[in-house]
A protein has these predicted regions:
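A cross-family phosphate/adenosyl-ligand binding-site feature
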Residues: 1-141, 146, 160-166, 171-173, ...
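Cys/His-rich Zn2+-binding cysteine-cluster or related metal-binding knuckle/ribbon modules and their
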Residues: 149
Length: 232
């Protein structure tokens, strides 16, 4: 099958989405669509290289907001029905809101719009799917209560991208999630994979419900449940 997999800038269900994408890439031709935010977030969580690894060659491609500019020419293939399937996982509340209001000004939202025109089946995993609280994983974080404000911050010196502002914070736009800082800090002042609880906003839940009613779009609660629905 010819499949498009689009990532948006959500950290929740991101690792699970990458794992599901890798599974599909084993036996299918895959094009990856990256929003600008997803590029940043994939790097923060140390997952960007895994996404890039499944692309390359004649049939597996990587398209991003940065290399598709403002006209997103690659999405024209979707309007022509040249894909069997478009998957958007994870899908942020911002992306859902744009889609349900007919806005297609990013690579991913434009891909969904063009898929609708080309009658390409579209499967999505919104991160705001039902009311209540949800646990999610944070990228690397400097724990100030543990930081000893060493004269020479070993974590900052070891960071290959200069992402650590000593004693203050981690610049997540520079962070690639390699974990070097956590491994080297003698006071365990850097955390990775910390779990927090987030509350789902009512407006985001309402937009997801609207998304579910849109023609040609199916929604799932996890990437695994999406995979399980496919007869591949």
């Amino acid at each position: 099958m010819k499949i498009g997999w689009a990532f948006t800038g959500a950290g929740h269900l991101l690792k699970e989405s990458v794992e599901a994408m890798e599974e599909l890439a084993k036996d299918n031709d895959l094009t990856v669509f990256l929003s600008q935010a997803s590029e940043e977030v994939l790097k923060m969580y140390g997952l960007y290289d895994r996404v890039v690894a499944v692309t390359g060659g004649r049939y597996n491609e990587l398209a991003s907001d940065s290399n598709q500019k403002f006209s997103f020419p690659i999405t024209g293939r979707l309007s022509l029905g040249k894909y069997d399937l478009l998957i958007v996982s994870p899908t942020t509340a911002n992306t859902v809101a744009k889609i349900v209001h007919g806005i297609s000004d990013t690579l991913v939202t434009n891909a969904v719009a063009q898929a609708g025109k080309g009658r390409v089946r579209t499967l999505m995993v919104p991160v705001d799917i039902e009311p209540g609280d949800v646990e999610t994983i944070l990228p690397s974080k400097l724990e100030k209560t543990k930081c000893q404000k060493c004269d020479e911050c070993e974590a900052a010196l070891a960071c290959p991208n200069g992402a650590i502002i000593a004693h203050e914070e981690i610049d997540l736009l520079k962070c690639i999630g390699c974990g070097t800082c956590k491994d080297i800090c003698p006071y365990d002042a850097v955390s990775t994979g910390k779990i927090i609880t987030m509350h789902m906003r009512e407006i985001d839940i309402e937009n997801t419900q609207k998304l579910q009613k849109m023609e040609g779009i199916e929604i799932f609660d996890t990437p695994q449940s999406l995979l399980d629905s496919l007869d591949l």
